[in-house]
Design a protein with these regions (language model features):
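Sec-dependent signal peptide recognition
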Residues: 2-9
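Feature activates predominantly on carbohydrate-active enzymes
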Residues: 102-325, 341
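C-terminal motif of bacterial Sec signal peptides marking the signal peptidase cleavage site
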Residues: 15-18
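Contiguous, structured surface segment used for ligand recognition
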Residues: 20-167
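A general secondary-structure junction signal
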Residues: 86-88, 98-100, 207, 263-265, ...
Length: 351
């Protein structure tokens, strides 16, 4: 029995040791934290130091635009006003080069950092932008500060990186309908998305709980539909003017982020119906929803007014967003009202 116990204990210890051993291995490029993980990264000896005399070298006007963007960011945290040269610089410089012969896709780049020069190459300005975002992550985290930070050695490790995204679409969806998010906060989020090379921003602009985009042809959408009374009797609301929408889109575009607007239909439409009751099957007087869940009152599919309204709204929204996609929701639409609505039933029979 004693022998059996010792054998079992030994086996258990061996199993435990085998489970533990991976955690004792050297972490991926210890001390280098780049998100997302580059396709290939080799850490070399030494480091490159950014100083007040460091320059950007921009090989093309596109590269100069990227250099200008990041020179401003670097100045915010370091206080260094880095010069941008259109003539080749061989040392103490960050070189941004367009190279159509690179074996990467249009969002890919290479980054080669020695103790004298950082060279970033890409086929496009977008690739250079992502290469610079990697460089920013290689520097101390304080580089993202919006105020000058003193006492920091602005160094990055000597590395050789080749990178391109695995997925063409890399996005998030933001819902400012249930909880309104001011423009300045959205800009901060876009900055973070750009840092992590996210390229799609899905903006959920309408919901049961609030309509958040100005539509000039239908002013009640924001006069009524953007506001709700919370459980304590306090009015809660907010919306984006069309000028603010343009401002956010321009801000995102400058960070190579495409903005996809969403006008939810045929469900999740109580805020719009509260503003224009004739858009529903019952035409009752309603208010934007103050709780979560699925609302039974949806756009009436039997009324021509509904389709005219949606066409008008989309006609105003589309020009504000130059991207390829327009999102119309389509989820969670109860059929309760349609089943009892003569106009909806008539349309169903005829189509």
């Amino acid at each position: 029995m004693k022998t059996l116990f010792l054998l079992c204990a030994t086996a258990a210890l061996c199993l435990f040791a085998s489970c533990e051993s991976p955690t004792k291995q050297m972490p991926y490029n210890q001390g280098i934290n780049v998100i997302p993980k580059p396709l290939s990264l080799v850490q070399n000896e030494g480091s490159f130091k950014v100083t007040k005399s460091t320059k950007f070298y921009a090989s093309t006007p596109e590269a100069k635009t990227i250099a200008t963007f990041f020179a401003s960011k670097i100045e915010s945290s370091t206080g260094y006003d880095l010069a941008i040269s259109e003539e080749e610089v061989s040392s103490n410089a960050i070189a941004l080069l367009i190279d159509n012969s690179l074996e990467v896709n249009d969002e890919g780049y290479t980054l080669d950092a020695t103790d004298k020069l950082v060279s970033i190459k890409a086929k496009t300005a977008k690739g250079l932008f992502y290469g610079m975002q990697t460089l920013m992550q290689l520097l101390p985290a304080e580089i993202e500060s919006t105020t000058v930070v003193n006492g920091i050695a602005w160094t990055l490790p000597c590395v050789t990186i080749k990178d391109e995204p695995r997925f063409a679409y890399r996005g998030i969806m933001l819902d400012p309908c249930r909880h309104f998010i001011p423009v300045e906060n959205i800009k901060k989020q876009l900055d973070v998305l750009a840092l992590f090379k996210i390229n799609q921003f899905h903006w959920h602009l309408t919901e049961d709980q609030g309509w958040r985009i100005e539509i000039k042809k239908y002013p009640k959408l924001t006069e009524i539909g953007s506001k709700r009374i919370d459980g304590e009797g306090t009015e809660y609301g907010g919306f984006y003017t069309q000028e603010q929408i343009k401002e956010v889109v321009a801000y995102a575009t400058g960070r190579f982020i495409n903005v996809i607007p969403e006008i939810e239909l045929p469900g999740h439409a109580l805020a719009a119906i509260s503003a224009y009751p004739e858009l529903s099957c019952k035409s009752d007087s309603l208010s934007p929803r103050i709780i979560w869940g699925v609302e039974e009152d949806v756009y009436c599919a039997g009324k021509e007014e509904t389709f005219k309204f949606l066409e008008d709204v989309i006609a105003e929204v589309v020009p504000l967003f130059p991207g390829e996609y327009f999102h119309i929701g389509g989820d969670e639409c109860p059929k309760v009202r349609w089943e009892k609505c003569p106009l909806c039933q008539k349309r169903m029979r005829e189509n």
